[in-house]
A protein has these predicted regions:
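Acidic donor-binding loop of glycosyltransferase active sites
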Residues: 200-214, 227
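Conserved donor-binding/catalytic core segment of Leloir-type glycosyltransferases
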Residues: 116-133, 138-141, 145, 154
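A short, active-site helix/loop in glycosyltransferases that binds the activated sugar's phosphate group
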Residues: 76-100, 301
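N-terminal pre-catalytic "stem/leader" segment of glycosyltransferase-like enzymes
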Residues: 1-45
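Active-site proximal beta-strand in glycosyltransferases
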Residues: 35-63, 77-81, 102-106
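Nucleotide-activated donor-binding/catalytic signature segment of Leloir-type glycosyltransferases, i.e.
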Residues: 168-193
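A charged, aromatic-enriched C-terminal amphipathic alpha-helix characteristic of glycosyltransferases
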Residues: 13-18, 252, 256, 273-313
Length: 329
């Protein structure tokens, strides 16, 4: 199998796994049969294959931190990063040189259709796992709901997306607050197609992220759905959004962050239905659809793999090189 599964990914329906499986469906089986494409977690190396290491995690992750070592990097013919911010961070943390071994290929989506939205009720949505900022969103929304009876928050959030149902237990009190609030609905885990269908009727993607991430497929899909995306300028979100979303300066202090987010979300609720904002969101959608479309990204992968196959057509040229002796004074 060109696209590897491991003990963690096999039960997951997360972004990494969805993209990996989607790419496998779109590429010519004849092209990829000579490849070993590893997503983040290295388990074994196939020396007769052309090896591509596709990174979706941070360089601080123990599963990828081995890239600090030149010998580890030399095992791969190409290292693919899922975003520019992530690539820069690997250079900074792991000392990876800026050279032709690396390449950035964005995380793809299927662009969502353009729809006409109604604004009799302002619908907010959260579509990521709970540890990324749901603990800020819920109390902030509770306060805003006192001010705006016409707002509603839908929460699609659960570790079940990764096959980790037990991890939800610590967030159960938070989920219960959502279930018990008349202006909030907790959906738990839902298939991606169901989430995307809901995005088409929503107006604001409320995402007070406190979790460093390389990029955010949930944000990309919300941009494509024409939502006003409200999130901090944190981690890879600036790169993901192209600086086009309604970003704010967050704070590592949760209480300060919550107060800042309250102001940002309040502003979004007041303005999301205006003609000026709606016209601007059309531009944001064009950007997201152009940059992240599957047709573009799959073509980039096809070009990359075709070039590597030409370069390493001889199986004898694919072996892992012997470790080099480095004299340290």
């Amino acid at each position: 199998m060109a696209f590897e599964e491991n003990e963690i990914s096999v039960n997951s329906q997360g972004g990494t796994e969805s993209v990996k499986r989607g790419l496998a469906e779109r590429l010519d089986p004849e092209l990829i049969k000579d490849f070993q494409i590893i997503c983040s977690r290295v388990r074994k190396i196939e020396e007769d294959k052309i090896r591509v290491y596709w990174l979706h995690d941070l360089p601080e992750d123990p599963e990828t931190n081995h890239l600090k070592e030149q010998a580890s990097r030399d095992r791969f013919h190409k290292i693919v990063y899922c975003g520019n911010w992530q690539y820069s961070r690997y250079q900074l943390v792991c000392g990876i040189p800026y050279d032709s071994q690396g390449i950035v290929i964005d995380t793809p989506i299927d662009p969502l259709p353009t729809v006409t939205k109604q604004f009799d009720k302002i619908r907010l949505v959260y579509t990521s796992t709970p540890q990324r900022g749901l603990n800020i969103l819920v109390p902030v929304f509770e306060e805003l709901a006192k001010k705006y009876p016409n707002i509603h928050l839908d929460v699609f959030s659960s570790f079940k997306i990764y096959g980790w149902a037990d991890a939800d237990k610590q967030f159960e009190p938070l989920y219960e607050r959502i279930r018990n609030h008349p202006q909030m609905t907790y959906h738990g885990f839902a298939p991606n197609e169901e989430v995307k269908a809901h995005l088409l009727n929503a107006h604001i993607h409320a995402y007070p992220s406190i979790w460093l991430e390389c990029n955010s497929r949930s944000v990309i899909e919300a941009m494509s759905a024409g939502l006003m995306c409200v999130h901090p300028n944190f981690g890879g979100l600036v790169d993901t959004s192209g600086g086009l979303n309604f970003m704010y300066q967050g704070d590592q202090d949760i209480n300060k962050h919550a107060n800042i987010f309250y102001q940002a979300l309040d502003h979004a609720i007041q303005n999301v239905s205006s003609d000026g904002v709606q016209d601007y969101l059309k531009l944001v959608k064009v950007y997201a659809d152009s940059r992240y479309s599957w047709s573009k990204v799959a073509s980039q992968w096809e070009d990359l793999l075709t070039g590597l196959k030409q370069q390493y057509g001889d199986v004898n040229n694919r072996k892992v090189p012997s470790a080099k002796f480095v004299y340290n004074t």
